[in-house]
Amino acid sequence: NHIENFESDVQSSKVPLTYVGYKRSEKYESYDYFWKSEQFSLLNLEGELHKELRGLVAKAFLPRAVQKLVPFMEEKSIELLTKKNSTDFDLLKDYAQPYSISIIGELLGVPASDHAKFLDWSHKIVKMYDFRVNDIDAENAEKAARDFFDYAQDLLDRRRVDPKDDMITRLSQVSENDVRLSDHQIICTIILLLNAGHEATVNTLGNGFYGLLSSQKTSEQISEESSSMNDIVEELIRWDSPLQFFQRYVLEDTEIDDYKIPKGSKVAILLGSANRDSEVFDNPSELNFNRENKDHSSWGGGIHFCIGAHLARLELEVSFKHLLKQNLSLKAEPERTGAFGIRGYKNLLVGD
């Protein structure tokens, strides 16, 4: 079973890998700001630099600060669902996107009036993460990265003069053994938190709620089958992961189950495939909210385990709790975005 063994070895750091973005590849050659915004992203770093930066970011990403957001999550979820039109409600555009972007904005300390800009930048930048990127999308991503970088620098400068109880202030103040994050590193972290946090949450909500509706299970059956909202969230993100693969390069000659992978080989870690491995999960294509094995791959693993998993879990638990109370039904079969790496729908039309 190459997939599961490879995943297991990656998570336990037995397979030495690096990311294509760690060195400037041809993909970034003409796009200075996109490269600049990715250069110190935790997703792209390895070794001591990754360890140092992740440690500093983790100190700023305080569990208590995340927990303090729960009342805001509850309020925002109820507000958006109260506004819904019973005959024309797009769960992605009218709920998931404004819900997710408002929470990331609240965490970072971004004014609500700027959330629409954040949403636009995120949509444009993440298109660069797929296999097929056309010139127009690449140019749009470059401009979005430049605008985002300039905006974040301005906000960071203001926080140094006027500190707040927000993530940007904490990132600017955190230190370890007299080591601090540079402005460039902080801005890359802000961009990562938006793109990874927002896009993943939106697509998990869309993929997951479609799964709930298509399963034909009632809210009562789902509640009876699961012991907690966390059970529901973990099963939905396993069943249809928002991130389907991650690309890396092998740093040393490696062997997995007698399969030789030469140094320098490009490998794709297929997270969605590992999550549907029948040798690991019983009836993997079925939604089972009482599943004992919750060891899926959607949060990543090892040194690259999702640093915002605690925030994402809370966002999703609050959302699905309120969505399940709505007794919504599917109004039209949704269309996939067509992207391979980041998996989601263009829309998800639901109603009473």
Predicted regions and their residues:
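Cytochrome P450
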Residues: 1-352
